[in-house]
Amino acid sequence: MMQSKLASLTLKGFFTFGLFLGALFSSLAASAQQASPSLPLLFDARERLARPDLSSLVRLRFLTSVDFPPFNFTDQNGKLSGFNVDLAREICSELEISDKCQIQALPFADLRDALAASQGDAVIAGFAVTPELRRQFVFSRPYLMLPARFVRNLAVPLDGKTAAALSSHPVGVVRGTVHEAMLAAFFPTLKAEPFDTKDALLAALKDRKVDAAFADALQLSFWVSSPASAKCCALFDGPYLSEHFLGEGITIMLRQKDSVLTSAIDHALATLSRNGRLQEIYLRYFPYGLY
């Protein structure tokens, strides 16, 4: 997936932005009545990463885009918002450089060249880590993994609470995707029913043409809590993580020469994970959880 965001995972094209906001706000309201979902720890709580000296830093400009909700987008008031935007601000606060921090939005296609040309210092926009990008840039440690999940039609009785309960049921998946390959590798005995698009897959699930589906947890989480699902379905089993199929996770991209800044960002991410601030931001945008 050269020079792309985690394209198969973005909500763009999955449903409209208005529907995304509706799902988000309804999720926020409902989450107050639910136990808080946990964010898996990606940093060892015992690990203490050194905090580099940033006293000579003149500016830290984060670059992002506005087409990757709920990670980075403009809200209904035109304000730059999202998980990544809030995280960038928390990183600056943790490093005690908030007065030196800026966040600028550019078209996604321009981010790579802008970083290379020193028009910004770090890209926080959901770039997929690829060997090509690693030859030119460095990446922070991942701060969020996007898993795969099953979703089931609640009208279909299942004998169990794990994927084994789906053994006699058709499971939909989008043809030609990493999730189709992952389903075949992880669950070779399940009966996969391929569909050409996500819309076709979810329509079939809603209409009980398939009993379950296997796809990206981010998309499924917002769909099941949105009016589009008509409360037909729920997440089931999982999560399932695989670096081979799903990549290294969401990271921050920097220039190779900026090793001190990279170490500082890793220090901030580890601290935010340890003190619970990363979890707070996660719950703000994923109140139903991905895991």
Regions found by a protein language model. Give the residues of each.
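Sec/Tat signal peptide C-region and signal peptidase I cleavage site
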Residues: L28-A32
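Bacterial N-terminal signal peptides
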Residues: K12-S26
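N-terminal secretory signal peptides that target proteins for export/translocation
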Residues: M1-L11
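Proline/Glycine/Serine-rich low-complexity intrinsically disordered segments
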Residues: Q33-Y291
